[in-house]
């Protein structure tokens, strides 16, 4: 009879300890140790990632035969963009996001697209019955004989079903519901999630089947389970968006087969998710012209420039400590830029509340939007209207200088394509590229220069 053993494991990094500790020594997180019950058995010689039957031997990398397997085209351009050109056969992809954001809808539509291309897809749900999945598929118009559905949570039965169907793609919804009988802990525990993910990795690498697994997120927005889970998979995709907005953004935070800077944008409708071909037009369609505190910035999301409206509201505070609130941008960046404006431009902002928002529910983390934030703050503080036909681009340093940004030609061309008449850029970006004839480009070297150009003083 196997001997039962108790241990404590960190939910964030997987650190193991014989006793409970308030602070994990591995990742320094507090109150993350949970109790796990395991049975001590003989060690398995099975490897999670194998290259086939027999014993693998070291060989020179120059003698390794490279088999160029074509990627699987999903027929969804936004998803292909995020994945780096399509699904890589034998890859394991983790999809995370808030509850109700549309993860299952996205993957069910992906299954339908591949099934329409005569590719076998196995959709395994541990949260819905087969009839409930059918109801959802009818609403989305997903009907194909090449799409197989299964309601199962037992890892052994799931592996058997994959062998019987022999699909091109497998969807697991979700990894927190799958369990292995050999592990005594409950489904969704650290040990179950780790071992089930390792089993799916082994299946993907040995059979060449692409597997997408859905992962729940914590209150902090991170994928639930040990951080080891994200290290094991090939790609990690986050599906995000505001609950009260119809737009959803798919980002890759890890991708072994492509860039991690790409972004795919979808719009949630009654018939499901629809791709947004030109996100700049969508994010600017509700913009009010001739108002104080509004500025348009050009942010690079991977290889695609996106024009987004930045809004700022500056008002006198009635408390001892002024508030600094930001939605869609880093809160600390706002405090830094306000300090630069106060020190280098002479604005008295220490007794002002500041509220900065990115319209459309988008999150921007690129330094090139610094100048746009500064102009919005100054515009609201002085109550001066900004030019509605103007785009502002530039990074701000602590000394008040406007620093060079990358891919300035793509940003300016996108602004010209959408009908903007003027763009403010760093003066160091003025040479080495062709300026469109339909737009005026003005170079500035400091924040003071930028405010004189945009606000007149």
From Swiss-Prot:
Cysteine disulfide links: none
Region (Lon-protease-like): 353-457
Cited CDD domains: RadA_SMS_N
GO biological process: recombinational repair
One protein family per Pfam: AAA_25
The protein's role, per its UniProt record: DNA-dependent ATPase involved in processing of recombination intermediates, plays a role in repairing DNA breaks. Stimulates the branch migration of RecA-mediated strand transfer reactions, allowing the 3' invading strand to extend heteroduplex DNA faster. Binds ssDNA in the presence of ADP but not other nucleotides, has ATPase activity that is stimulated by ssDNA and various branched DNA structures, but inhibited by SSB. Does not have RecA's homology-searching function.
Name used for this protein in its record: DNA repair protein RadA
Natural source organism: Halalkalibacterium halodurans (strain ATCC BAA-125 / DSM 18197 / FERM 7344 / JCM 9153 / C-125)
Gene of this entry: radA
